[in-house]
Amino acid sequence: HAINGGGDSNPGYDVILMKKGMLDIQAVGDIFAAPNGQLVFDAMKMADKGHGVLLLTLNYAGDQLAGKQAMKLARKAGLNVRQVVTGEEIRYDPNGEDNKRGLAGAVALYHIAAAAAREGKTLEEVAEIAQHYADNMASITVKSTDATHPQNGMSFGDLGETDLMEIGAGQHGEGGGVRVPMMSSKDTVATVAEALCKALDLKPGDKTFVMINGCGATTMMEMLVLFKDTVEFLKAKGIEVVASMVGEILTVQEAAGFQMNIAKWDEEMLRLWNTPCRTPAFSKE
């Protein structure tokens, strides 16, 4: 069984995770706050049916702390547990810190891991598949306006007051990226996709999964234009897109922009991806 723990500040994310073909349990914290370790441990106990539990965690300080506490409690209680941490963000600012934050790419990983578990693979095998996936994906966030806090409406920054966009802004607008003048979709995609291809060492003939995730205030039309430009950019390099996901998946309130996630796939990943999945926000038959 697979579980995840994280703060409750990403509309769309919580509902897309649960039910058939995804996670079994989500341990949810308060708004912009990670759950505590005890809550994550309680979720692990609920998920445990005798075959082990895989804890999937995005690389944020609070989530990591809760995960470590929960893993310690679980081992003390004699549970068979493993943990995989996703941190696929690549550093765009050459002078910035290499934070490796976990972004929307984790959602595809959740389905891959869940599919492997449903096939009856052991906990060790599922954890290995999840870790392999985590090691072969990369993401960048581009923001043009900052998120607002749902409890007080305050903006997290001043990006919306400028004519700039930030490449490498992080999920919640934590910053650490580079602010540049607004560009067209095609030019933005060329900048971002080139960086991701370099990070993954993609070569002609490689198979990839592409996700365009809206940050919260991005229209479907905008996301589809970005996706089209991404597919064309990769095709020109001889890189095949074998699967994709486009939509508002991991968001923050009123943030305009997108995340691009590219994962390097093999036939096993594609086979697992093509298994059924049914959640309130994401279904595959």
Residue positions per predicted region:
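N-terminal loops that bind phosphate or other acidic moieties
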Residues: 1-285
